[in-house]
């Protein structure tokens, strides 16, 4: 067999890039946790490692090495003439501004937390057993919220809900809403803040996430109209909901058809179900790109094991695609299904009884 040196070098280059990126993920988590990015942005000019260490009460030698790694990765800018470091506006937008729709440190916390389960998941590959979200490192839940919240804040109120038939008007007047798989409550609180005449209940099977979500509601000033309860997707209480939401969670469920059927039972006759899922095409070959790679990898470590840990274990995966999602929704009894809108990272579907 003849080795094509050009292809070999391309592959080796990709491996080295990924090796550096894998190590770099932990450094982004450190930078976010210690406020290093925010301190660089606040400085508003190039500063030395000693100045950054002083501003963040950290060790200069560690900070200097961290800065060099960041500069090598393009996450921090380096002024060679003055041996100092700074954040460009774009770098600050992505790494230091929590209000930015492109704020990404949460993605790295999610990734670092997920890979801590690799030894256990390696064994599950052999046995076929699942691995529930609740079994993962606690950092995964904060990382997931940090990763998804900027996108929700940028799109949920301004474009996703308005793309649904008649939902925005109901929410403005006063609607009864259930947010299933709410996690730490980011989506629930965002909706409650935007629609003060409506009431919201967030449901999640993870009790520790529900405790945090209640704190988020208090901190967000919406606790009087928002409640959070521990419940699973197939048995959450209540009926006659005007609006039910699923944010990036349907594909995690072992029995999504059963979960969808319960949504149908819980909705008012003129109610709407919004399903937000990761962007995906129906064919594998159309998902072989950087976004697909990120979602397939996350799905291997998180989503597929989570589904396999539950009854039925359909394991749709994070790249299920519209055709498979539609099949699940229509099989559960819904008569109406459509793609309402999309972003480069999400597909937003509307279903009605």
Regions found by a protein language model. Give the residues of each.
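A short glycine-rich, Lys/Arg-flanked "PGG" loop and its adjoining helix->strand segment in the class I
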Residues: 257-269
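Short amphipathic alpha-helical interaction segments
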Residues: 58-69
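Short glycine-centered segments of the SAM/dcSAM-binding site in methyltransferase folds
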Residues: 176, 271-272
